[in-house]
């Protein structure tokens, strides 16, 4: 599996180029998510109760030859609202929105949302302080990308 270097997105112009490169995630699906809080309980049962990492990694697979599978990393996660479709409905993403508001990056699984729409949006919404992504090659299909070594 080839995992190229991460590409960090910081500006509205970089978001626009990224979204155009991904065709606004048309004909895509959220395959997997992995969250790292930073909090843990150690071997002696002492707790480190601080969410000082808050990193969400999300794998998207697309029906497109270029960048068919990407991993998106949301750093300093502030909000994750996950609204998965159940098995009676299809879950493909037809369009998406990514914007910067108040210094945070928002990603939603619906297109043409404005800053004013974010609070009322009932689909999947992610808000984080930072964002980066990378293309993942030779890993299409149902096999899990994030798997435990235990």
Language-model regions, residue ranges each:
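Surface-exposed, interaction-prone regions used to assemble/regulate multi-protein complexes
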Residues: 1-150
